[in-house]
Amino acid sequence: MAERSQNLQDLFLNSVRKSKNPLTIFLINGVKLTGVVTSFDNFCVLLRRDGHSQLVYKHAISTIMPSQPVQMFDGEESQGA
């Protein structure tokens, strides 16, 4: 059975969506958005904060900074001891 490959962007967004990890999104115009990713597709990200949803187009995103470390792959262990 062939394993379906995913791109890094989808792995990252799916991980923060599943973990409900709060994040900050910086747009290319300098606007800073914070919230939790509830859904995403090829063109946009649905961000939720304080009971309100915002649809953010990916072409407007500059940087995404999660508030906690992101575990993107199953079996990934913490670094250090």
Curated annotation (Swiss-Prot):
One of its GO terms (molecular function) is RNA binding. Pfam families: Hfq (PF17209). The keyword Transmembrane does not apply. The keyword NADP does not apply. GO terms for biological process: regulation of DNA-templated transcription; regulation of RNA stability; regulation of translation, ncRNA-mediated. Residues 10-70 form the Sm domain. PROSITE patterns: SM. GO terms for cellular component: cytosol. Keywords: RNA-binding, Stress response. PANTHER family: RNA-BINDING PROTEIN HFQ. Homohexamer. RNA chaperone that binds small regulatory RNA (sRNAs) and mRNAs to facilitate mRNA translational regulation in response to envelope stress, environmental stress and changes in metabolite concentrations. Also binds with high specificity to tRNAs. Belongs to the Hfq family. This is RNA-binding protein Hfq. It comes from Mesorhizobium japonicum (strain LMG 29417 / CECT 9101 / MAFF 303099) (Mesorhizobium loti (strain MAFF 303099)). The lineage of its organism: Bacteria, Pseudomonadati, Pseudomonadota, Alphaproteobacteria, Hyphomicrobiales.
